[in-house]
Amino acid sequence: MTTPRKFDEYRWNVLVDGVPLNVESRYPISDPSTGRYLTQVPDCAEADVDRAVQASRQAQAEWGALPPRARAAKLRELITLLREHREEFAMLDAIDGGFPISMMRNDVDAALELMDIFADMALDLGGKTIPVSTNLHFTTHEPFGVVARIGAFNHPFFFAASKVAAPLMAGNSVILKAPDQTPLSSLRLAEVAAEVLPQNLLITISGRGRVAGRAIVRHPQIKRIGFIGSTDTGRSIQRDAAEVAVKHISLELGGKNAQIVFADADLEQAALGAVNGMNFTWTAGQSCGSTSRLLVHESVADQVIARVVELVSAIAVGPPLDENAQMGPLVSQAQYDKSVHAIGEGIREGAKVVAGGGRPEGVGEGGWYLAPTVLADVRPGSFIEQNEIFGPVLSVIIFATDDEAVAIANGVEYGLTASVWTSDITRAHLIARRVEAGYVLVNGGSRHYWGLPFGGVKSSGVGSEESMEELISYTETKTTTVVLG
């Protein structure tokens, strides 16, 4: 499976015990660049999920008994093998998700780097002694057993590969739920991983979320779940899981992230940061971390908006396998319709389209293409200012005072990221302290730094990832006391 023309003939499978699982039904996957049929994948049922979990339990027992450095060595073997398949995984995500292949190569590289960082943390899995008495008291970190990772469609390979690293390093086996819309790289990951990892240690399940995903969440032998996706689905997972067992659940959910540009900021860098932070050229704005609200001080608003419009209008939209394309289509008809509806609501409430707003030129009639869009004169509290669009739509809001900027930034249910642009170091610290976000950048867009905890507050999630916090979260702490006399 190395070229686009093989999609029709390649049979995608869920592997259990080293062979394809006999899944009764399949469902179609569409090509976002044309809107037409691409391929079909297994649509796993509850019984299929249970079969995978039972196989995974057997694999975990031996894996969890290995010393952490031995697990790290195996993880690095996997990293080396995945690197050999870099172009294949980038192509899969480009075709399956509509994302520019150049950016998907970056996604593969980022995933492998983060996996390597988790391998580096092997010896940090030790516990500690606590001198609370003359006896010996110590803690150890022990794996949960079988854990589940449920990925999102917008960074398919990155969320598959990098998000299984911490659970595996911690000694767990992993059931990986492939995204409904973009399952191909997750399925291929399991095929490649089977060449170096113990059998059934990593099993990818494909299928509709309402059946396969729900079966994973409700399975009584999966006690740890990590989910990336929408806030509504995150709440559903919490409800479903609570009905069957007490489970440890981490959630990286939606965002309506603000970039706050003060009058004393480097306005050129702020404009660049606003456009880059929107992830137009990575995922067509389909990112929980997209900085979709640009808050600009009234004294510099015209200047900043003009530069943002210039930058956005220069983005080349085209087919994902075109090396010159900087932005591809949206992943599905549903995502396209959601963005178009949001733009319409914004206009209805008084916003003005200053860039994009419709279908870009030169992409033909097929596919779910939408030009990168900027809306000015967006009112705080309006539909488009409050709701996560998950598309290429940037809203510009004007503020007059620091207090007003903070109030607008905090006036949504989300709290994932925020950016503060200012040359005043005191203001930078004060605003960063006041904004309600789990990840704050000063004079920066939306870059992740691997090793730093990343996670949201409010309705943006529970828990932190990409860091030691993520690794430890896939263990349970055991305290032991040895009475010495």
Curated annotation (Swiss-Prot):
Domain of life from the UniProt record: Bacteria
UniProt-annotated binding residues for NAD(+): G229, S230, T231, D232, T233, G234
CDD domains named among the record's database cross-references: ALDH_PhdK-like
Keywords on record: Aromatic hydrocarbons catabolism, NAD, Oxidoreductase
Protein EC: 1.2.1.78
Induction, as annotated: By phenanthrene.
Regulation: Inhibited weakly by Mn(2+), Mg(2+) and Ca(2+), but not affected by Zn(2+), Co(2+), Cu(2+), EDTA or EGTA.
Catalytic activity of the protein: 2-formylbenzoate + NAD(+) + H2O = phthalate + NADH + 2 H(+)
Any Pfam family matching the protein: Aldedh
GO terms for biological process, alphabetical: phenanthrene catabolic process
Residues at the catalytic site: E252, C288
Top enzyme class: oxidoreductase
Coiled coil feature spans: none
InterPro entries (alphabetical): Ald_DH/histidinol_DH, Ald_DH_C, Ald_DH_CS_GLU, Ald_DH_N, Aldehyde_DH_dom
GO MF annotation terms: 2-formylbenzoate dehydrogenase (NAD+) activity
Keyword Secreted: no
Temperature-dependent activity: Optimum temperature is 40 degrees Celsius.
pH dependence (UniProt free text): Optimum pH is 9.0.
Subunit structure, as described in the record: Homotetramer.
Function field: Plays a role in phenanthrene catabolism by catalyzing the oxidation of 2-carboxybenzaldehyde to phthalic acid. Not active with 3-carboxybenzaldehyde, 4-carboxybenzaldehyde, benzaldehyde, salicylaldehyde, 2-methylbenzaldehyde, 2-chlorobenzaldehyde, 2-fluorobenzaldehyde, 2-benzaldehydesulfonate, 2-methoxybenzaldehyde, 1-hydroxy-2-naphthoaldehyde or n-hexylaldehyde.
Family statement drawn from the similarity comment of this UniProt entry: Belongs to the aldehyde dehydrogenase family.
Protein name: 2-formylbenzoate dehydrogenase
Gene: phdK
